[in-house]
UniProtKB/Swiss-Prot annotation:
Transmembrane segments: none annotated. GO terms for biological process: cell differentiation; cell division; establishment of mitotic spindle orientation; microtubule sliding; nervous system development; reelin-mediated signaling pathway. Dimerization mediated by the LisH domain may be required to activate dynein. It is found in: Cytoplasm, Cytoskeleton; Cytoplasm, Cytoskeleton, Microtubule organizing center, Centrosome. The keyword Oxidoreductase does not apply. This is Lissencephaly-1 homolog. The lineage of its organism: Eukaryota, Metazoa, Chordata, Craniata, Vertebrata. GO terms for cellular component: 1-alkyl-2-acetylglycerophosphocholine esterase complex; centrosome; cytoplasm; microtubule; microtubule associated complex.
Length: 410
């Protein structure tokens, strides 16, 4: 490739600047003489540091080209696999495929949580920018922002009807929103530190929250009163989730344990300790997963009649563990993420586990065979949260890169 005279002059000035600013005086004066460069302070300023800038931008572009090439190859592979095969594949086995259907921008800080609405074709994201945003996942349209918290929104949860949304924040409050009028109808105070997790109980009458103050609290939806406090964790409680019928709640903590509590008595039924670092996330197994879990493990529950309940946990030790709550046994450990695990979920069909982590990936696990069957490079930064739609073929992820991505499953 031949350079024009102007490009040649620019390159010569940039080389001269590089030689001079790095102390190669002899080479600089020789080069200046041979390249016939005149003394021009204005031009010298213009080309200061230009060679280094060009060099680093070339490296950046090369990296981008390589990324795009690998995405292109992945997409080609998907087309050859995804076409006719997807018609034959059972929807229970559909998994997210690259590239993402939508990458949605709007948050001004890391996204902390993403969830689907149980009825409408919308999803909701929470962020460190203190806002909650509502998006249409079918069109990718932004719908509205809910404002009210004064610090990072840490978690959000719908009731089963989708009429109420609960949110919690580092501002130490829990808010309840009417999801039809989008008004905040109640604010609950009582925790002494950052409220890291919230969930509306299956009966819709109570909310459970977890905090950096080491406690979990249960609140009455109708009055906003705190009716129960669960204590036992020795450190920050990261996440709390009720089981399907609301009789048990699971919590995980910086104390490296997962605990299961009986709601009625506030008693800690099980303390699960095998993780070697902070436990970031937990998820209950749906009944659709029980047959595969029993196949995959010689679970004690087989002998005792009714299986389970089973629980997943993800940790900063980079592993995912599956637990039989009735025995307190760890049934399996899945290893493959290269950084902290931030989200764990069972596929609605029950055969797979879906996880996200600070290694920027979304992974799908065939847990019966204890193998990672697909890895998607999901975001430019840590992936903080994921949700799998219960009925429609979509997965949503949120990231420190401030985006929300919608992935189609097939």
């Amino acid at each position: 490739m031949v350079l024009s005279q102007r490009q040649r002059d620019e390159l010569n000035r940039a080389i001269a600047d590089y030689l001079r600013s790095n102390g190669y005086e002899e080479a600089y004066s020789t080069f200046k003489k041979e390249a016939e460069l005149d003394n021009n302070e204005e031009l010298d300023k213009k080309y200061a540091g230009l060679l280094e800038k060009k060099w680093t931008s070339v490296i950046r572009l090369q990296k981008k080209v390589m990324e795009l090439e690998s995405k292109l190859n992945e997409a080609k592979e998907e087309i050859t696999l995804g076409g006719p095969v997807s018609q034959k594949r059972d929807p229970k086995e559909w998994i997210p495929r690259p590239p993402e259907r939508y990458a949605l921008s709007g948050h001004r800080s890391p996204v902390t949580r993403v969830i689907f609405h149980p009825v409408f074709s919308v999803m909701v994201s929470a962020s460190e920018d203190a806002t909650i945003k509502v998006w249409d996942y079918e069109t990718g349209d932004f719908e509205r922002t809910l404002k009210g918290h004064t610090d990072s929104v840490q978690d959000i949860s719908f009731d089963l009807t989708g009429k109420l949304l609960a949110s919690c924040s580092a501002d130490m409050t829990i808010k309840l929103w009417d999801f039809q009028s989008f008004e905040c109808i109640r604010t609950m105070h009582g925790h002494d530190h950052n409220v890291s997790s919230v969930a509306i109980m299956p009966n819709g009458d109570h909310i459970i929250s977890a905090s950096r103050d080491k406690t979990m609290k249960m609140w009455e939806v109708a009055t906003g009163y705190c009716v129960k406090t669960f204590t036992g964790h020795r450190e920050w409680v990261r996440m709390v989730r009720p089981n399907q019928d609301g009789t048990l709640i699971a919590s995980c903590s910086n104390d490296q344990t997962v605990r299961v509590w009986v709601v009625a008595s506030k008693e800690c039924k099980a303390e699960l300790r095998e993780h070697e670092h902070v436990v970031e996330c937990i998820s209950w197994a749906p009944e659709s997963a029980h047959p595969t879990i029993l196949d995959a493990t010689s679970s004690e529950s087989k002998k005792s009649g009714k299986p389970g309940p089973f629980l997943l946990s993800g940790s900063r030790d980079k592993t995912i563990k599956m637990w039989d709550v009735s025995t307190g046994m760890c049934l399996m450990t899945l290893v493959g993420h290269d950084n902290w695990v931030r989200g764990v979920l069972f596929h609605p069909g029950g055969k797979f586990i879906v996880t996200c982590a600070d290694d920027k990936t979304l992974r799908i696990w065939d847990y019966k065979n204890k193998r990672c069957m697909k890895t998607l490079c999901a975001h430019e930064h840590f992936v903080t949260s994921l949700d799998f739609h219960k009925a429609a073929p979509y997965v949503v992820t949120g990231s420190v890169d401030q985006t929300v991505k919608v992935w189609e499953c097939r």
